[in-house]
Amino acid sequence: MKRDFPQALHRLESWFAANGWQAFDFQREVWRAYLDGESGLVHSATGSGKTLAASLGPLAEWIEEQEQLGESGKVDTKAPALRVLWITPMRALAADTVLSIDRAVTGLGLPWTVGLRTGDTSSAERARQARKLPSLLVTTPESLSLMLSGAEAREKLSSLRLVVVDEWHELLGNKRGVMTELGLARLRRWNPKLRTWGLSATLGNIQEALERLVPGSDPALSPVRRVVKGVSDKKVLMDTLIPPDVDKFPWAGHLGLVMLDHVIEAIEGSRSTLVFTNVRSQAEIWYQGLLEARPEWAGLIGLHHGSLDSDVRKWV
């Protein structure tokens, strides 16, 4: 039976207003769907608020539980056990997810703890998590597999209410995606009422992606599912840089540096720029090439990829 969460949802809206924001309709739809026990897939443009759409539902659920406990004088002021597992395929961006969610937790005045567990996590932090997991844990598919292999995994994950798979398109159809699906299958066997939500901005096969994330072949283990479509009307201006001489193009070695001057011109004509490359080695080559061409940019531009030291990535 569906329940109302008037006080909890009002607090979410008030927090948005206090920050000068207004919640999107798709965010409200995801909150409501989660509170009704549903799972699904959020398809919305990059930067449109998918993280808050997926993370605030569990917070509202806990707020409502405390409201009910308050009527009997049993309000719990301690951080709850693990309730949300947030799986991200990109370790380099996991820290940003933690900061975004922790800001919401702090702004709402909740005792929740938000933690991070990736290959960068220190041994001291791992030891703390072994004693008690945070209320919300951001991790990777590989770290999830290690967690599930532990002798006490089922007991430690018994309080889990929600699994969020961020950037689902990055995992769909590859080995890491299969690893994630296997982990989700085990978690659902342990808790058939577990809710699962995927987030993506660039899916073309939405229904297939939903089926892989929340299979409907076993009704006993599959809750009500839905696709929530959010902001998609972003205006994109595309400009193509073409080499002046296309007879010969360096497909090996310093791929693309023949366009260095043209890229520099594009950067100088913009307020802020992200330069993406296909692989990490090309990122290193481009960073070096830009600095050699513009030494005065030292300290103004940064290199970022998953193989860099975690402190360097945080600084960038």
Range-by-range predicted roles:
Residues 1-18, 22-41, 45-48, 53-316:
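Helicase motor core with emphasis on the C-terminal RecA-like subdomain
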